[in-house]
Amino acid sequence: MTYLSQLEALLFVAGEEGLSLRQLASLLELTPTALQQQLDKLSQKYKEDKESGLCLIESSRTYKLVTKECLAPLLKDYAKAPINQTLSRASLEVLSIVAYKQPITRIEIDEIRGVNSSGALSKLVAFGLVQEAGKKEVIGRPNLYATTDYFLDYMGINHLEELVDISSIAVEEQETTLF
């Protein structure tokens, strides 16, 4: 596995929060100079690859993989898609996690699901079901996410307390799988 592929994978999994030079250097066990060379190489790879929809950016001393600017109209159309489209299984999982664990960071959602949740979370934000709800007071200050009033309307409830108690569901499932 090359440093370039490892770097790309880390930036993909980090999603919109990105990773700092220090975090990347530590994870890849590279000097800042060697890491900068790999970042430059990855950036150049995306610039030259007309078939790729991604590019590497540095924002607030954080590196992120983002979509190329020329794709903005297409992505805006996608984001405007009506909510009456069915939500994907991934989006429903993320929405459930946010509803029951809010406020929660994307990384915490990823840890619960075991996979990257950036796309599903972005879609839920675009649909107005989830919103940023501040920053977590830890290193990196990641965004916190919570459900919106539209989520309550969409679910036909007035308060989060009206959501089904998941502990009772877990007990029922456990009882049915014992035999």
From Swiss-Prot:
GO BP terms, alphabetized: cell division; chromosome separation; DNA replication
Free-text function comment from the UniProt entry: Participates in chromosomal partition during cell division. May act via the formation of a condensin-like complex containing Smc and ScpA that pull DNA away from mid-cell into both cell halves.
Keyword Cell cycle annotated: yes
Principal localisation: cytoplasm
Intracellular or extracellular location(s): Cytoplasm
Highest classification ranks of the organism: Bacteria, Bacillati, Bacillota, Bacilli, Lactobacillales
Stated name of the protein: Segregation and condensation protein B
HAMAP family, A to Z: ScpB
Family matches, as InterPro entries: ScpB_csome_segregation, WH-like_DNA-bd_sf, WH_DNA-bd_sf
Pfam family, one: SMC_ScpB
Organism: Streptococcus equi subsp. zooepidemicus (strain MGCS10565)
